[in-house]
From Swiss-Prot:
Keyword rRNA-binding: no
Identification of the protein by name: Probable multidrug resistance protein NorM
One Pfam family it belongs to: MatE
Organism whose genome encodes this protein: Aromatoleum aromaticum (strain DSM 19018 / LMG 30748 / EbN1)
Topology in membrane: Multi-pass membrane protein
Record flagged with keyword Cytoplasm: no
Protein localization: Cell inner membrane
GO terms for biological process, alphabetical: monoatomic ion transport
Homology family: Belongs to the multi antimicrobial extrusion (MATE) (TC 2.A.66.1) family.
Length: 463
């Protein structure tokens, strides 16, 4: 029995057709990402109304939790290009085993992740978290640890479903999870519906519960959807295979580290910015939130590019892969540039939505220009990095991410903010954004160069 082919794999495609396929895949991913962001915002609002210590605990704890999860989830993203290549090559019998090995890897990665969440003492000491906040943070992280296996298993399903070009299920599951988490977290934190008020730990418990709900929905979808039957996903279950696991790790560890490098660089920038005072760090946070929100669009399109490039590479159709990169790059940069122009024109009312404090708004308005430029070049490097993942090239991109985000954005930003000529006595958070712009410009050049090299390889230029 042949697998259902979701996209044409051999017919010539126009740029409009490719753009349509990218939009078809990207918009459900974008909605799913925005729903996930709304859960983090909800946790902040819910605990903020409960108490300052609990809000601080969730702020610190969620930063630790997200860093650990993104590192491990990044490794599991290796399932996406692996399955996309199998799908493009119509290796139906290899698709089910690839998912099974991904699930095994998720369970293995859960062990060190649980240990870090259950015993975060050294991480909190490094951050110099006050004792009263640290206690609540430990409780929050311990609660989230119970849901870590579920979130890793679900993210394996997430990568698998993306690779097959079926992102709408991810959007629906994200809607279910978000609509469950918000009232559940409120009830657990504040003690509604007869439950005792738990404070910060309530958000952690709710996060763990909805992670298991997400995985249950994903597993149920795989088990009962007819389109997946040819892949025999749960039949002939295979034990962990050393060769397959090593292949996933070889591909996934650089992906996980790349994600961790980006996340940690912005986390550390926020910590360094805190030295500049409440107004500076609050203004930085406003602009960082805007940047994160805008980033969801190029990230969603880039995920679609990864999948379509991976499918084309697996099908040995390099012309289609190159066309996907070309159209995807133009589409993404064009949209982000438009958003940047609109943000610049409407910067004052947009910033006013985030803060009523004139001092905070003044800092944020002084930084808006930087993110308008930053987002354009960040979109270029994001598309290029994901296209390279579609070609199963991940190690060199990891090194480039380290150079640009740790070496320039973080280290260079620290120097520009605190030690650049004229700023020793009047440090400014703008230094970090100046360095970030330089870092993304360099990243866009280096990633663009590497992508061109990869696309010109003999196996990627045949027609």
């Amino acid at each position: 029995m042949s697998a259902p082919i979701l996209f044409p794999l051999s017919a010539p495609e126009s740029s409009f057709t490719i753009a349509g396929r990218l939009f078809h895949h990207a918009w459900p991913v974008l909605v799913a990402q925005l729903l996930s962001m709304s859960m983090l915002i909800a946790d902040t609002v819910i605990t903020g109304r409960y108490g300052t210590l609990d809000l601080a605990a969730v702020a610190v704890g969620s930063g630790v939790y997200i860093s650990i999860v993104m590192l491990l989830v990044g490794v599991l993203q290796a399932v996406a290009p692996t399955v996309a290549h199998h799908f493009g090559a119509r290796r139906v019998d290899a698709i089910g085993p690839a998912l099974q090995q991904g699930f095994w890897l998720a369970l293995m990665l859960a062990l060190p992740g649980i240990a870090l969440l259950a015993f975060p003492g050294f991480l909190l000491e490094l951050s110099s978290v006050p004792a009263d906040v640290a206690g609540k943070t430990r409780d929050y992280l311990l609660a989230t640890a119970f849901g870590l296996p579920a979130v890793l298993l679900y993210r394996t399903f997430y990568a698998f479903n993306n690779a097959l070009g079926r992102p709408r299920a991810l959007m629906m599951i994200s809607f279910i999870v978000t609509s469950t988490h918000i009232p559940l977290a409120w009830a657990l934190v504040h003690g509604a519906f007869g439950l005792p008020p738990l404070g910060a730990i309530g958000c952690g418990i709710s996060t763990a519960i909805v992670n298991w709900i997400a995985f249950a929905c994903g597993a149920g979808y795989l088990a009962h959807n007819r389109d997946y039957r040819p892949y025999r996903l749960f039949a002939n279950w295979q034990p962990p295979r050393r060769r397959d696991l090593l292949a996933l790790l070889k591909l996934g560890i650089p992906m996980g580290l790349s994600t961790f490098i980006e996340v940690s660089s912005f986390t550390l920038i926020a910590l360094f910015a805190a030295r500049l005072g409440a107004e500076a760090v609050a203004g930085h946070r406003v602009v960082a939130n805007l940047a994160a929100l805008i980033y969801m669009l190029p990230l969603a399109i880039s995920i679609a590019i990864l999948v379509l490039v991976g499918q084309a590479a697996g099908a040995r159709e390099p012309a289609r892969a190159r066309a996907t990169v070309r159209v995807g790059m133009g589409l993404t940069v064009g949209l982000v540039a438009l958003i940047g122009v609109l943000l610049w024109v409407g910067r004052e009312p947009v910033v006013a939505l985030f803060s009523a404090d004139p001092a905070v708004r003044a800092v944020a308005l002084g930084l808006v220009f930087y993110i308008c430029i930053y987002q354009i070049f960040d979109a270029v490097q994001t598309v290029a990095a994901h296209a390279l993942r579609g070609y199963k090239v991940t190690f060199m991109p990891m090194l480039l991410h380290a150079l640009c985000f740790w070496g320039i954005a973080l280290a260079g930003g620290y120097w520009l903010a605190f030690h650049a000529p004229g700023r020793e006595q009047s440090p400014t958070v703008a230094g970090f954004w100046e360095a970030s712009v330089v870092a993304t410009i360099l990243a866009s050049v280096l990633f663009g160069w590497l992508l061109r090299v990869v696309m010109r390889r003999p196996q990627n230029v045949q027609t």
